[in-house]
């Protein structure tokens, strides 16, 4: 189940939509699986933001975040819901992701927004540039999901396990077009998130099973991911 309102910012004004699309949507599926006694494998996509990192890293042993954001709180409830229904011998897994990037993302998602600004030589306004996040490329995430689908039922955190700062993303994107980002980027504190975590990275141990069982490693992350996004975007008319 990969549907749902996935914007942390938009969830503040769309609390009910966020809850319905994630919690109620998931629960409807689980009730049917339980009633029909189906052994269908069911994955629920979730977010690393539900956890409070230890030394900037997250794993499944981390405590839940105390952040009051509606999206984060909803996904925490969904995480527990999956674990609760798994007790009925259902084949259920939480798949925890960090940032997943794709050129099909909405234009307001950070990396795509920055790359479009750079490619079109346009000025952009951003929030906190001094946070570090773990960005993964969509094609590699899909492959990792397929490999994970053959493994035993439990919860997984899937990410590249590498960090890059917002500032480095901006510098790299504008550099690809021969531009000095300082002339094009301004900061507005209204885009700063409440209770912003400085560093949110998935531990590389989270995906050791992919390396050990399938010899799979993430290759597109950091500066290479920025180049991939930039390359795959056209310029706006």
Whereabouts are the PLM-identified features?
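Short-chain dehydrogenase/reductase
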Residues: 26, 30, 79-83, 142-145, ...
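Flexible, glycine-rich beta-alpha linker
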Residues: 50-52, 66-70, 93-113, 132
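Active-site beta-alpha turn of Rossmann-fold NAD(P)-dependent dehydrogenases/reductases
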Residues: 3, 43-46, 53, 68, ...
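Active-site Tyr-X1-5-Lys
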Residues: 53-55, 66-93, 115-120
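Conserved Rossmann-fold NAD(P)-dependent oxidoreductase catalytic core, especially the SDR/UDP-sugar
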Residues: 1, 27-70
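NAD(P)H-binding glycine-rich loop region in Rossmannoid oxidoreductase-like domains
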Residues: 1-20
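C-terminal substrate-binding subdomain of Rossmann-fold SDR/epimerase-dehydratase oxidoreductases
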Residues: 112, 118-237
């Amino acid at each position: 189940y990969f549907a749902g309102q996935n914007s942390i910012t938009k969830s503040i004004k769309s609390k009910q939509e966020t809850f319905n699309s994630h919690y109620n949507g998931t629960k409807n599926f689980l009730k049917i699986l339980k009633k029909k006694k189906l052994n269908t494998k069911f994955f629920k996509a979730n977010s690393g933001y539900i956890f409070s990192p230890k030394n900037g890293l997250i794993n499944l042993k981390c405590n839940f975040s105390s952040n009051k954001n509606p999206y984060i709180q909803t996904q925490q409830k969904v995480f527990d819901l999956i674990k609760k229904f798994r007790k009925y011998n259902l084949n259920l897994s939480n798949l925890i992701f960090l940032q997943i990037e794709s050129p099909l993302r909405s234009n307001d998602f950070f990396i795509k927004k920055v790359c479009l600004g750079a490619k079109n030589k346009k000025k952009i306004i951003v929030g906190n540039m001094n946070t570090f996040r773990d960005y993964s490329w969509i094609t590699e995430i899909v492959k990792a999901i397929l490999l994970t689908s053959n493994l035993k039922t439990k919860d997984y955190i899937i990410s590249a396990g590498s960090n890059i700062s917002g500032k480095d993303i901006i510098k790299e994107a504008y550099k690809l077009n021969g531009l000095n980002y300082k002339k094009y980027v301004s900061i507005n504190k209204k885009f700063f998130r409440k209770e912003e975590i400085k560093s949110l990275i998935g531990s590389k141990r989270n995906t050791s099973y992919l390396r050990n069982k399938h010899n799979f490693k993430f290759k597109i992350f950091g500066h290479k991911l920025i180049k991939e996004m930039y390359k795959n975007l056209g310029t706006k008319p």
